């Protein structure tokens, strides 16, 4: 019996290696056949899910597989033993921009720091060379916070936050980023924190988003009520298989909490794993916020 178990373990191990290779190459149809019959796509392996696993070497991971796994309900914001979510792995040295974009739109936290406070997705965007203005604007639109402070250990870094860090480290690497963030900071000081998000709100929208998805992007309670009164389906899904409620959770920040409560009351149709994951994250943010 023990020999049989060992054979089973070896078979499963080889099967996982095969699926890993298929996902790395974007051969999702073949991978799906195996997940449908022999492997659990939602399995947690140690502290990793399949998104973590295929992003260990991010540069050669096909973004099609990232989208496939998210559509299948694999948690895109799960933190591993290093306090890293899939977005952190995707942005390791800025190696997989397309995968990062998908994970960001799936709710990835651009400000999440690993335990060593070295692998922060937003920082990685700012370190990229050549400067990628489009990607930086996308990260800022999805909640990237250049003023967020981190408790650092080990080597000291000039500046208490990303903005100060880049302004104080006057390196050629940061020239374009520094100039962009300097103007960004001026706009925030002049017009307020919501100015940039409102200016670039179109970045939060996708072609497959319904009118109801677009209404939650604006956290527009009156429009949501109107659409529901007109018979819009609260369970309609976008390209990531996100309902309007899950979409709202994925872009929600602490400043939207009151509106989020109202949206939940209007759109709630049963708790899903995605909703649970985002609620846990909001609880963590509230706990972190209360310490300052």
PLM feature segments, named:
Residues 1-38, 42-59, 67, 171, ...:
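Intrinsically disordered, low-complexity regulatory segments in ankyrin-centric signaling systems
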Residues 12, 27-28, 40-44, 59-62, ...:
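Alpha-helix initiation and capping sites
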Residues 12-19, 43-56, 79-86, 113-126, ...:
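Ankyrin-repeat boundary/"N-cap" motif
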Residues 21-26, 53-61, 89-96, 124-131, ...:
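Ankyrin repeat A-helix N-terminal signature
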Residues 30, 65, 98-99, 134-135, ...:
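Conserved ankyrin/ankyrin-like repeat signature
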Residues 35-40, 67-75, 101-109, 137-145, ...:
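Ankyrin repeat domain, specifically the short helix-to-loop turn at the C-terminus of the second helix
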Residues 116-141, 145-148, 235-260:
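Ankyrin-repeat and related helical/solenoid repeat scaffolds used for protein-protein interactions
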Residues 146-191, 245, 249, 257, ...:
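Leucine-rich solenoid repeat scaffolds
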């Amino acid at each position: 019996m023990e020999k049989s178990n060992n054979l089973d373990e070896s078979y499963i191990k080889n099967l996982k290696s095969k699926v890993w290779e298929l996902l790395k190459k974007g051969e999702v149809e073949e991978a799906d056949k195996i997940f449908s019959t022999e492997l659990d796509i939602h399995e947690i392996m140690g502290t990793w899910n399949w998104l973590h696993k295929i992003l260990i070497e991010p540069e050669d991971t096909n973004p099609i597989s990232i989208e496939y796994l998210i559509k299948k309900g694999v948690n895109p914001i799960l933190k591993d033993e290093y306090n890293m979510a899939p977005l952190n792995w995707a942005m390791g040295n800025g190696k997989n921009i397309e995968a990062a974009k998908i994970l960001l739109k799936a709710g990835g936290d651009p400000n999440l720091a690993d335990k060593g406070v070295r692998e922060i997705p937003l920082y990685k965007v700012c370190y990229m060379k050549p400067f990628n203005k489009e990607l930086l604007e996308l990260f800022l639109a999805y909640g990237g916070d250049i003023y967020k402070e981190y408790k650092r250990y080990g080597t000291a870094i000039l500046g208490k936050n990303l903005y100060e860090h880049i302004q104080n480290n006057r390196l050629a690497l940061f020239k374009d980023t520094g100039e962009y963030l300097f103007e960004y900071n001026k706009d925030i000081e002049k017009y307020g924190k919501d100015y940039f998000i409102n200016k670039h709100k179109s970045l939060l929208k996708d072609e497959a988003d319904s009118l109801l998805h677009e209404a939650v992007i604006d956290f527009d309670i009156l429009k949501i009520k109107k659409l529901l009164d007109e018979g819009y389906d609260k369970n309609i899904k976008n390209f990531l298989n996100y309902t309007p409620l899950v979409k709202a959770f994925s872009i929600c920040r602490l400043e939207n909490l009151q509106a989020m409560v109202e949206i939940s009351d209007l759109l709630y149709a049963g708790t899903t794993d995605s909703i649970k994951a985002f609620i846990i994250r909001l609880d963590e943010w509230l706990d972190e916020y209360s310490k300052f």
